[in-house]
Amino acid sequence: MWAIVDFEASGLSEHSYPIEVGYSLPDGTSNSMLINPLSTSDNWTHWDQQAQLDIHKLTRQTLEQEGMQVVDVCQHLNTVLGQYELVLCDSEWDLFWLGRLYHAAHMRPSFVLTEVSHWLKNKNGLERGHFKLALDSLCEMKHQAGYDAKQIRLVIDTLVKSP
């Protein structure tokens, strides 16, 4: 059994950090958590205004007011995702943001996050392009982590069930 994780972030640079994480589980359960950038001892100050306007639509103020503490987010992810033999994400950026999140919490994940194209290549011989094409044609990504994780799961389900 496998789970899907998706992140939204403050931007797309080496200075960016996770602002929302969501997951989708085999039973159809999905969840997302906003992350409070003030709850880390790391210097999470980078903010890409264009990413806010064009991608995730979240303000830093919303994150500061409604976001969870990084330690609480990591503990929740470890509890929920630690029971799955495989946890997939759809980009290497997600791997980067997972590392940044756990570093900020001074914790380690209880699961291994694998980029989906590597898994699909090994499982079905499918290239990243197949996944991207299916993702673009079968669903609309809203850049809301929980919703997007669920959409990614639907696409992967379709690809692995295809002859």
Named regions from a protein language model:
Residues S39-D42, W47-L53, R60, E115-R153:
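Active-site-proximal helix-loop-helix substrate-binding element of RNase H-like nuclease domains
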Residues Q52-I55, E66, V80, L101, ...:
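Residues that form generic nucleotide/phosphate-binding pockets
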Residues E85-S91, W97-L101, H130-P163:
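Acidic, Mg2+-coordinating catalytic module of metal-dependent nucleases/exonucleases
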Residues W93-L113:
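Substrate-recognition/cap helix-loop segment adjacent to the acidic, metal-dependent catalytic center
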Residues P109, S117-L120, P163:
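Short non-domain terminal segments
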